[in-house]
Amino acid sequence: MLSRGKRLGYAAYERLLQWELSGTPDHVAVIMDGNRRYAEKQGTKKQEGHKEGAQTTEALLNWCDELGIREVTLYTFSTENFDRDPEEREHIFDLVEQKLRTFADADRVHEAGVCIRAIGETEMLPERVRDAIDYAEGRTAQYDQLNLNIALAYGGRAELLGAARDVAAAVENETLDPTDVSAETIEERLYEGPTRDVDLIVRTGGDERTSNFLPWHANGNEAATFFCTPYWPEFRKVDFLRAIRTYQNREDSWRTTRAERSLALVRAIEQSELPTAKRMLGRFRDALPSTEREQLDEEYDLAD
């Protein structure tokens, strides 16, 4: 239990972080790690760690709704998790089934326009979990304000391997010309789920690795990553805001780099190409350091 002073400090820091944010990612993927280690630290059963982790998941969805994030993907159960103790595994399945049905019926889910979808090799899951998936997807299929993708029986390598096999089979059957294979060809054969590339990956629990989560949507987009030490049940809104700040800092750095490269390009091109280059540079003008921005305005008259 935190002291009153610490609670006030966290609240103030949380407000400061939120005030400093100038933008949020469209798609956040979360690796919710540390439920079992949290339970061990607390001296309780693993099941209690998973229950408390589920409460953090509900809080996360509220934060995403508040901040206007459009898509969230939760790494809930990997294909490797099938190797866990049967009792723990069944408890996780019970919890997933319960939460899927609860979310699907929750007023706040319908008010916020949340569309729930499962991604992964769901045919490997128990029938009761598959039924709960069908129920949740059916109840929320009409919404598009916030896409909630729940990764169940998911493995990044398996997803890419399945897509590659489908492409190979199509080529062998002569329904696909090898010269027509493109990024879109692969993407069409991935698990049906994410509608956007991942902007930010968050992992709790102290491990600094992405566990091959959403490799096509995250690695291909060079998503920002945020690793933090709190176990998933300990994850707070202030931690989430710090993660978003990491994304924001990366975006700001990217824009500055693009702006500086555009400026170098403008200075190097021929006069006949200058109008096109100036339009491109104008898009990134505000990302330049103030001294370079002033010099740019003077040289090329880009200021409003």
UniProtKB/Swiss-Prot annotation:
Binds 2 magnesium ions per subunit. It holds the Pfam family Prenyltransf. GO terms for molecular function: ditrans,polycis-polyprenyl diphosphate synthase [(2E,6E)-farnesyl diphosphate specific] activity; magnesium ion binding. One of its GO terms (biological process) is polyprenol biosynthetic process. PROSITE patterns: UPP_SYNTHASE. InterPro entries: UPP_synth-like, UPP_synth-like_CS, UPP_synth-like_sf. Its cofactor is Mg(2+). The active site is at D33, N81 (proton acceptor). Mg(2+) binds at D33. Its EC number is 2.5.1.89. It catalyses: geranylgeranyl diphosphate + 7 isopentenyl diphosphate = tri-trans,hepta-cis-undecaprenyl diphosphate + 7 diphosphate. The keyword Transferase applies. It is an enzyme of class 2 (transferase). Substrate binds at residues 34-37, 46, 50, 78-80, 82, 84, 203, 209-211. Keywords: Magnesium, Metal-binding, Transferase. Catalyzes the sequential condensation of isopentenyl diphosphate (IPP) with geranylgeranyl diphosphate (GGPP) to yield (2Z,6Z,10Z,14Z,18Z,22Z,26Z,30E,34E,38E)-undecaprenyl diphosphate (tritrans,heptacis-UPP). It is probably the precursor of glycosyl carrier lipids. Homodimer. Belongs to the UPP synthase family. This is Tritrans,polycis-undecaprenyl-diphosphate synthase (geranylgeranyl-diphosphate specific). The gene is uppS.
